[in-house]
Amino acid sequence: LGRIAAERGLMWDVHCDETDDPMSRHVETMAREVTRYGLGVRAAGSHLTSMHSMDNYYVSKLLPLIAESGMTAIPNPLINITLQGRHDTYPKRRGLTRVKEMQAHGITVGWGQDCVMDPWYSLGTADMLDVAFMGLHVAQMTHPAEMARCFTMVTENNARIMGLEGYGLKV
């Protein structure tokens, strides 16, 4: 799929590693394919929840690989916290990828919501402020600067991920 996207000048969004399995390595493969085909920011990995279960050493190698590829990330906090960790007793995983760590590596991250009133998540409203609100809680991004970043994630970052130019208001 990455090759086809590159050949046709298309964007490539993969719902990738949406699992609790710490051994899932699809995002690593995706990052390598993004680099191989030169897709960069035209490629987005959605969910990436396996990273919440991966050991820190592996993630310390994975995040630079993702950053070098130029691909972006789209965690979906509402559905991810509902589906992931569902079979855990306690401690229970939050079901969200490593948002702050990705940002620290310069990876563009935009909050998403891919389930709106469907069998997986019947509570979706398609309101990105709801998504940002939940995301900042689950990712523990409650410092004022982090909260501001959460709202940038549903506006400017998502526009960048979608390839929209001239988005936003400037004074």
Question: Which residues fall in each region the model found?
Answer:
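Histidine/acidic residue-rich metal-binding segments in metalloenzymes
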Residues: 1-44, 50-72, 89-111, 167
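His/Asp/Glu-enriched, well-ordered alpha-helical/loop segment
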Residues: 11, 32-43, 82-83, 93-171
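Active-site-proximal loop/turn and secondary-structure-junction residues that shape catalytic pockets
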Residues: 18-20, 49-51, 77-81, 115-117
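Short Asp/Glu-rich motifs
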Residues: 23-25, 85-86, 121-122
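Residue-level marker of positions within ordered structural domains that often coincide
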Residues: 50, 71, 78, 137, ...
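Detector for Asparagine
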Residues: 56, 76, 80, 157-158
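Active-site clefts of carbohydrate-active enzymes
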Residues: 72, 80-81, 85
